[in-house]
Amino acid sequence: MQRLCVYVLILALALATFSEASWKPRSRLQDAPSGPGANRGLEPHGLDQLGPASHHRRQLGLQGPPQLVADLSKKQGPWMEEEEAAYGWMDFGRRSAEEGDQRP
């Protein structure tokens, strides 16, 4: 009986995972051409049809994925310092090479 419950649970989770992509509507923003002047020709009534995030996109200036990636790549959070401190001891290959260069 327990094995049957486990199988039913796994089946339900698998169906929920695979069906999630089918019920989400595709955004028309993905089909729009990207580029610096591509979004200038959009009319206000067209922006309302893009979805619930269109109001926020209008306030942000309709940045496309390349601009968002560029903005995010400029930002480094405090987690970068934590990762460097936590994993600094793993950098033994570079350190041993530097030590070998310093010896006469």
Curated annotation (Swiss-Prot):
Record flagged with keyword NAD: no
GO biological process terms, semicolon-separated: G protein-coupled receptor signaling pathway; response to food
Primary location recorded for the protein, binned into one broad class: secreted
Modified residue annotations for Phosphoserine: 96
Localization per record: Secreted
Residue ranges of the region described as Disordered: 22-70
InterPro entries according to UniProt: GAST (IPR039236), Gastrin/CCK (IPR001651), Gastrin/cholecystokinin_CS (IPR013152)
A Pfam cross-reference name: Gastrin
Function: Gastrin stimulates the stomach mucosa to produce and secrete hydrochloric acid and the pancreas to secrete its digestive enzymes. It also stimulates smooth muscle contraction and increases blood circulation and water secretion in the stomach and intestine.
Family: Belongs to the gastrin/cholecystokinin family.
Name recorded for this polypeptide: Gastrin
Species whose genome carries this gene: Canis lupus familiaris (Dog)
Gene: GAST
